[in-house]
Amino acid sequence: MDQTPSYSPPSGTAVILAAGLGTRMKSTRPKVLHPIAGRSMLRHLIAACQPVFSHIVVVIGPDMDSVAREAAPHPTVVQQERLGTAHAALQAMALVQQGEVAILYGDNPLISTATLHTLVQRRRQGDAVLAMLAMRPPEPGRYGRVITEKYQTGDYVSRIVEYAEANEQERAVTLCNAGVFCADAASMAAWLGGVENANSKGEYYLGDIIPLAIAGGGHVAAVEAPYEELRGINSKVELAEAEATVQIVLRRKALENGVTMTAPETVFLSADTLLAPDVLVGPHVVFGPGVTVEEGAEIRAFSHLEGCHVGRHTLIGPYARLRPGSVLGAGAHVGNFVELKQATLGEGAKANHLTYLGDVEVGARANIGAGTITCNYDGVHKHRTEIGDDAFIGSDTALVAPVRIGRGAITGAGSVIVDDVPADALALARGRQVNKPERAAEIRRQLKGSV
């Protein structure tokens, strides 16, 4: 998950391995498409790579068209047989451009741009032919240990030892392999082509490029990065843990940028949520993907926003829902149990209670009464409603689209509006009230007499 500025100019290639089945997820969805903070793991990693690498290639498995669509416009290559990580990386080398190439895993979505930049810069120092990421997990037991040796020019990696094969001294090492490697493209292609599958699973492992790099007379440098960035996500438990980690980071970033949250631990943000300074967010608010909120807006408790823009000094909620395509002008009000979808509210417009506004444009300062509904769907097509500036929509009005309410027009409460209403007109579309004296008392007597 990237939290850093862009690095310029990007160069080289990032190869993302995304062909794994992810069986521990117990899901029909490909592992890299599971979301964290409203964004797939794959898109998190692509976003981190883009400021550093000019070219990105994603390796997918057979029948993974959904992953290819998620990767677009970046090219994909199919690993027809899942023969290991080195084999997967080798499939991509025909698409790799000159310069550095980094091999990454699609289930490591929290790597930051800063860490990737550090990895590339370490490789470019010239004393190491291969740079790799390493970490110190709180529970290192299942990870391969990074064994280093001292040389005249510094400490370099001598080998990776899997935990099952490590002796007591090696198991005591806390520096562990994160599985991310960076080298020049020509060397990487040669090493990948030289990896053998002489192991119990008969697979070609990416980590086996290390002895090949050393055998060629080169050094391998380890770049240590935070475990929270490099942890793999292989199960729903780990997915939930990653979500919690990311939410903490996003909340802190928002608070540091001047957002007020009365109960930040209950607020859920998306990776692309943009909240301006002096926005006030109440408890239990959810921001889905694609939300921007301008300064001074207040989002009250239990509101849900996605794909919308909220203008300055607006008031949202509590219990409001803003769906994709909704745009609120400055000073607009959207109150409790109001739902907006593809709706534009002009400056100062208000819809304060129990309302559905879909496929509608509401003018400035218009007032939408409680219980108003835009009837936008005829069973086949969606239709739009237009409400002019300063219009007043009476409570419990049904606006049957397509329909236009003119500037300054008023609709009577309980009306079903099927025709356009001219500017400054009063529209009444309901039966005339009839009062029948004593009829209620007569009805009660009849009912009681039937008991």
From Swiss-Prot:
Region: Pyrophosphorylase, residue numbers: 1-236
A GO cellular-component term linked to this record: cytoplasm
EC number of the protein: 2.7.7.23, 2.3.1.157
InterPro entries reported in the protein's UniProt record: Bifunctional_GlmU (IPR005882), GlmU-like (IPR050065), GlmU_C_LbH (IPR038009), Hexapep (IPR001451), MobA-like_NTP_Trfase (IPR025877), Nucleotide-diphossugar_trans (IPR029044), Trimer_LpxA-like_sf (IPR011004)
Keywords annotated in UniProt: Acyltransferase, Cell shape, Cell wall biogenesis/degradation, Cytoplasm, Magnesium, Metal-binding, Multifunctional enzyme, Nucleotidyltransferase, Peptidoglycan synthesis, Repeat, Transferase
Entries under Pfam families matching the protein: Hexapep, NTP_transf_3
GO molecular function: glucosamine-1-phosphate N-acetyltransferase activity; magnesium ion binding; UDP-N-acetylglucosamine diphosphorylase activity
Subcellular localization: Cytoplasm
The protein's annotated pathway: Nucleotide-sugar biosynthesis; UDP-N-acetyl-alpha-D-glucosamine biosynthesis; N-acetyl-alpha-D-glucosamine 1-phosphate from alpha-D-glucosamine 6-phosphate (route II): step 2/2; Nucleotide-sugar biosynthesis; UDP-N-acetyl-alpha-D-glucosamine biosynthesis; UDP-N-acetyl-alpha-D-glucosamine from N-acetyl-alpha-D-glucosamine 1-phosphate: step 1/1; Bacterial outer membrane biogenesis; LPS lipid A biosynthesis
Gene3D superfamilies: Hexapeptide repeat proteins, Spore Coat Polysaccharide Biosynthesis Protein SpsA, Chain A
Region listing for N-acetyltransferase, in residue ranges: 258-451
Annotated acetyl-CoA binding sites: 370, 376-377, 395, 413, 430
Residues reported in the UniProt entry to bind Mg(2+): 107, 234
One Gene Ontology biological process: UDP-N-acetylglucosamine biosynthetic process
Residues that bind UDP-N-acetyl-alpha-D-glucosamine: 17-20, 31, 79, 84-85, 105-107, 144, 162, 177, 234, 323, 341, 356, 367
Record carries keyword Membrane: no
Matches recorded under SUPFAM superfamilies: Nucleotide-diphospho-sugar transferases, Trimeric LpxA-like enzymes
Chain residue ranges for the region called Linker: 237-257
Primary location: cytoplasm
Catalytic activity: alpha-D-glucosamine 1-phosphate + acetyl-CoA = N-acetyl-alpha-D-glucosamine 1-phosphate + CoA + H(+); N-acetyl-alpha-D-glucosamine 1-phosphate + UTP + H(+) = UDP-N-acetyl-alpha-D-glucosamine + diphosphate
Cited function: Catalyzes the last two sequential reactions in the de novo biosynthetic pathway for UDP-N-acetylglucosamine (UDP-GlcNAc). The C-terminal domain catalyzes the transfer of acetyl group from acetyl coenzyme A to glucosamine-1-phosphate (GlcN-1-P) to produce N-acetylglucosamine-1-phosphate (GlcNAc-1-P), which is converted into UDP-GlcNAc by the transfer of uridine 5-monophosphate (from uridine 5-triphosphate), a reaction catalyzed by the N-terminal domain.
Membership in a protein family: In the N-terminal section; belongs to the N-acetylglucosamine-1-phosphate uridyltransferase family.
Subunit structure: Homotrimer.
NCBIfam families in the record: glmU (TIGR01173), PRK14353.1 (NF010933)
Protein name: Bifunctional protein GlmU
